[in-house]
Design a protein with these regions (language model features):
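Structural motif
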Residues: 26, 52, 79, 150, ...
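Conserved anion-binding
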Residues: 2, 68-72, 77-153, 158-161, ...
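Glycine-rich phosphate-binding active-site loops on the catalytic face of alpha/beta enzymes
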Residues: 79-91, 189-222
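Active-site-adjacent beta->alpha loops and helix N-cap segments on the catalytic face
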Residues: 14-16, 36-52, 64-71, 88-111, ...
């Protein structure tokens, strides 16, 4: 299965996004568009990035009643995105409805993945704030099995849980993993993190990397380093 690095373009405007991507010239990295940018610029930012040749992960984390999730995904399916997501906590029925809404009349659709637990969450937070008295591994894999049962393509989890997900759901079930930082970088507000090489060795199919690339002195060099470490599993010292 092909692996890739997805750049989290967590900018507040189209201008900032285009200025950043212009640094890559003819390279067309896979990009993630999140709530901040999508809510600021609307669907046109997605259309323009597709015209520019980028693959897009639209990260809106839909979590609503099944009917609303279905109708929302029906709208998103018209944007020619490559991947989008829902919250696994929305239940199996919601995920099934979202998948149905995302599927176009010709049977094609973007990849649909489910968010398990955000990488800013740890077990203490789950217990105190969410009243979930289980280990992170148990919670994430339970959500992953629900997503598989609903027919989804994979889950968002930390790279620390990727191997557990593959053990239960198979190698073809995708693990899309934020919480990736360089060994010499700052972890920021992330609590469950690995390096690109560690993520690859633990089974991540896609890694989502934001600030270590977007805030780097040389974003292109940082991106290439990330790709090299992820695809070569750390064999290159860059």
């Amino acid at each position: 299965m092909a692996k890739d690095v997805i750049i989290a373009c967590d900018f507040s405007s189209a201008k900032d996004t285009f200025d950043f991507l212009d640094k890559f010239q003819d390279e067309k990295p896979f990009v993630k568009i999140g709530m901040e940018l999508f809510y600021a610029e609307g669907p046109e930012i997605v259309r323009e990035l597709k015209r520019m040749g980028h693959k897009i992960f639209l990260d809106l984390k839909i979590h609503d009643i099944p009917n609303t999730a279905k109708k929302t995904m029906s709208v998103l399916s018209g944007l020619d995105i490559d991947m989008t997501n829902v919250h696994a906590a929305g239940t199996v029925n919601m995920m099934k409805a979202a998948l149905e809404g995302l599927t176009r009349p010709d049977g094609t659709r973007p990849l649909l993945i489910a968010v398990t637990q955000l990488t800013s969450t740890d077990e203490e937070t789950m217990k105190k704030d969410l009243l979930i008295d289980k280990t992170m591994e148990v919670v994430v894999t339970h959500y992953a099995m629900n997503a598989e049962r609903a027919g989804l393509d994979g889950v968002v989890c930390s790279p620390k849980e990727a191997s557990y997900v593959h053990d239960l759901c198979g190698d073809s079930f995708l693990t899309v993993t934020p919480g990736v930082r360089f060994a010499d970088g700052d972890t920021g507000d992330q609590k469950r993190v690995m390096t690109p090489a560690e993520a690859a060795k633990n089974g991540s199919d896609y890694i989502v990397v934001g600030r270590p690339i977007t805030e780097a002195a040389d974003p292109v060099a940082a991106y290439r380093r990330c790709v090299r470490e992820f695809l070569n599993q750390g064999e290159s010292n860059g």
